[in-house]
Amino acid sequence: MEMEMSVLAMSSTLILALAMALIFLFKAKSSSAIKWPPGPKTLPIIGNLHQLGGDELHIVLAKLARVHGAIMTIWMAKKPVIVVSDVNSVWEVLVSKSSDYAARDAAEISKIVSASSHSINTSDSGPYWQTLRRGLTHGPLGPLNISAQIPIQQRDMQRVIREMQQDAAANGGIIKPLDHLKRSSTRLVSRLIFGDTFDNDPYNDSMHEVVQDLNRFGGIALLEQAFSFAKHLPSYKRGVKEFHIHKRKIDDLVRPVVASANPPSNSYLGFLQSQNYSEEIIIACIFELYLLAMDSSASTATWALAFMIRDQQVQEKLYQDIKRVIGDGVDLVKAEDLSKMHYLQAVVKETMRMKPIAPLAIPHKTAIDTTVMGTKVPKGTCVMVNLYALHHDESVWAKPYTFMPERFLQGEDGKSVTEQAFLPFGAGMRICGGMEVGKLQFSLALANLVNAFKWTSAAEGKLPDMSDELQFITVMKTPLEARIIPRNP
């Protein structure tokens, strides 16, 4: 009897394994029947995964595109991913056929903190997404509300400068600017969510820590998307456990603030509550705004400082541009001054070109059967837009790997650069809704920091490491440390 049961169990296992193999082969055959764009040669089971190591993913894909074409197929195990990298293909995906590519290819693990893909960046396009985006861009991120934030943000920059001075005094003149800028960004995001009068440093500090912790697990989502069987791996299971732990931290942090708030109608919370969304969706939407906005302008400003530490001539030209507009002895650069600072705007653009905050954007998915540059793309296909490759295209940009703000000045080499090749915030239907506030925050921070301090290397002769690390956004692999010298002691 026991032998019969053993044989039966073995037979069942073999039948199950055979069935799974047949399903895999059927799917593989179905995929192979489609004429996908060309790409690097694959290996069984893993596809192209063995070719995606070494550098950060956006850099690896840019190198592969130079060999295999601006429209190529990368196989994440058995999953095809189309990567577009030049002006024409990127513009077709993001703008010309924006609605065709407006769905999202969200990882299952991301649903833990996004209320099952009910946040603005994880949900597919449709009536729900349109309502959510309209509420965000017409309310907290609308021009009237952003204008109201300007005097508050200017005062906050004065606070940042004071705290940097105190930090430097206690540490031999050396600071880590990213920490200060992140805290400023967190305060701004909190005001956009809860209203102008929101002022709660303990809450903001806790949110800052939660976002930093969660950023470390961005690679788990990629692992899941690459391997369908990743869910059975110990590392993935640990990642899921961490996501659930952070979800509880987020809930415990945000829930009491939401419950006690009386938000104005132009705040994000005011809009979310007006739609009668569930508490889970409200908390997910709030946290997403922190996750996407808290690090973006702060990290970009830090990249700019690193570039100018490496090139002191650029820093001096920017300082003189600031002085030309506001004069000597003025401690605060105001938002109204920024548009007059032409070299500042060039530095801002060149930083975003060199180090786009989301170099692969957020992965798109085809909502219908469509085409890209004449090639058929089936519904449900994941499409990555390599903004890093676009911003470093040698057919568009002179010396693309050199930091040259002058390329964006009128009459200089960059005068004829097409706007279609410079897309730091994406384009089309799913362009970043926080684009205007992000540019304002970055420009205001950079102008005030260069006006207040001269920025040099923390250790003489040791320049900042400009290596990328791709988390949810692109950050410096080695966080910047700098020596600051007050310009107006």
Swiss-Prot record:
Key words, A-Z: Heme, Iron, Membrane, Metal-binding, Oxidoreductase, Transmembrane, Transmembrane helix
Keyword Transmembrane helix: yes
UniProt GO cellular component terms: membrane
Tissue: Expressed in leaves, rhizomes and stems.
Factors inducing expression: Transiently induced after wounding.
Topology versus the membrane: Single-pass membrane protein
A Pfam family hit: p450
GO biological process: phenylpropanoid biosynthetic process; response to wounding
Residue ranges crossing the lipid bilayer per the database entry: 6-26
Cofactors: heme
Reactions catalysed, as given in the entry: (-)-matairesinol + reduced [NADPH--hemoprotein reductase] + O2 = (-)-pluviatolide + oxidized [NADPH--hemoprotein reductase] + 2 H2O + H(+)
EC number: 1.14.19.72
Localization in the cell: Membrane
Family note: Belongs to the cytochrome P450 family.
Protein's job: Cytochrome P450 involved in the biosynthesis of etoposide, a chemotherapeutic compound of the topoisomerase inhibitor family. Catalyzes the conversion of matairesinol to pluviatolide.
PANTHER family: CYTOCHROME P450 98A9 (PTHR47944), OS09G0441700 PROTEIN (PTHR47944:SF4)
Identification of the protein by name: Pluviatolide synthase
Gene encoding the protein: CYP719A23
